[in-house]
């Protein structure tokens, strides 16, 4: 067979599949009257005062390159935001970097941190982006099953994974509150993990994009609270301020690490959109508490779905953050998550994401996004009930 130019492309790219989340969402779009609870897209609009700040920036012709790390005022605003919200102290001049969404923050951090052959612990089920990015860096992802420990990584499980992999672990990737499970870590759980991370001189790459969407009495805690020198914190405004399309994220780390990540960021994207940065500055200052009303609504939706799905026989590790339910398919139903979701879409015209999209440890589960109006969720549960009960 004649070789094509494609055959000579980066072998890691050729071996990576398109995100199953996007793939499945597109596949079910053609089903008539389909009701989709598939994507992590807030159904709220960006707050008006943030949009007006961007409009003002356009009118004032703030439409040129900014500094690679971001506008100085924005970096100061992010530093103040993180200190107020999470009691973290970072120097805006040397320890914070503005990125094109948290996704670029994750990619730039991974590509900067890892060498070929480095081993990286990844608790699973896990968001789809991390493992492909680790492989692009030609590092080795080591997934650790958390489905039997409440969807959180315990210090004991982490120690066991380090031992079984032969030690010499370079990094761990943590996402909390979690996509897909909605589960987050308590303060004491993070503190215990931090001790293991420091003991083994590991780097913790922490995606905390859902930090403003936590439910219950305990607020979000960052790994940097317990192991700042070991931690790269990635955050942003997509979920907290309903700004997914604005593409603004942040990386916070020690100055020597930020200095190196900045090189990767510079050659990937140069800088974040100037207008998006104007909007972001408004978000982290005047909009510091914009997430509160959204959080209240998300919590109502979470409680509704949790109760309805539990009644139908789904087992759920109670989600304390983000806007996802990760539910174990009831006994007596199709246990292959892909087959279950395809059948559900065909028969009930309801689209949710198969758990296998989040690693083999997610098999037998489905992910439901409740970033949707309550009326839509109520109809979704009517369809789910009809399907499960065979009506």
List where the protein language model places each region.
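PLP-dependent class I/II
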Residues: 1-16, 27-31, 35, 39-57, ...
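A short acidic, glycine-rich active-site loop
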Residues: 61-65
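Conserved N-terminal alpha-helix of the aminotransferase class I/II PLP-enzyme fold
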Residues: 66-100
């Amino acid at each position: 067979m004649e070789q094509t130019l494609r055959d000579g492309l980066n072998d890691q790219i050729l071996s990576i599949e398109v995100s199953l989340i996007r793939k499945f969402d597109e596949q079910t779009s053609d089903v008539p009257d389909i009701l989709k609870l598939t994507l992590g897209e807030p159904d709220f609009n960006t707050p008006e005062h943030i949009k007006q700040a961007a409009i003002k920036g356009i009118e004032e012709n703030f439409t040129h390159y900014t500094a690679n790390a971001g506008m100085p005022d924005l970096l100061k605003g992010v530093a103040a935001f993180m200190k107020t919200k999470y009691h973290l102290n970072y120097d805006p001049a040397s320890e914070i970097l503005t990125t094109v969404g948290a996704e670029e923050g994750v990619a730039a951090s991974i590509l900067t941190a890892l060498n070929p052959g480095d081993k990286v612990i990844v608790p699973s089920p896990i968001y789809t982006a991390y493992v492909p990015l680790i492989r692009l860096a030609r590092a080795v992802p080591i997934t650790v099953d958390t489905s039997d420990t409440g969807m959180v990584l315990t210090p004991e499980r982490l120690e066991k994974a380090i031992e079984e992999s032969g030690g010499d672990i370079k990094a761990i990737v943590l996402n909390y509150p979690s996509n897909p499970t909605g589960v987050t870590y308590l303060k004491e759980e993070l503190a215990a993990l931090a001790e293991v991370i420091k003991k083994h001189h590991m780097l913790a790459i922490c995606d905390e994009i859902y930090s403003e969407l936590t439910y219950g009495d305990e607020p979000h805690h960052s790994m940097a609270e317990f192991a700042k020198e070991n931690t790269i914190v990635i955050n942003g405004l997509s979920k907290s301020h309903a700004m997914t399309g604005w593409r603004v994220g942040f990386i916070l780390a020690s100055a020597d690490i930020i200095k190196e990540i900045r090189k990767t960021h510079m050659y990937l994207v140069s800088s974040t959109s100037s207008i998006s940065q104007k909007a972001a500055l408004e978000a982290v200052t005047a909009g510091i508490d914009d997430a509160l009303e959204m959080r209240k609504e998300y919590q109502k939706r979470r409680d509704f779905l949790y109760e309805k799905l539990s009644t139908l026989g789904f087992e759920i590790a109670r989600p304390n953050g983000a806007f996802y339910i990760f539910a174990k398919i009831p006994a007596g139903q199709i246990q292959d998550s892909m087959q279950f979701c395809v059948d559900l879409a065909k028969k009930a015209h309801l689209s949710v994401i198969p758990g296998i999209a989040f690693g083999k440890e997610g098999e037998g589960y489905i992910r439901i996004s409740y970033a949707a109006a309550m009326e839509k969720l109520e109809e979704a549960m009517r369809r789910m009930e009809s399907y499960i009960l065979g009506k």
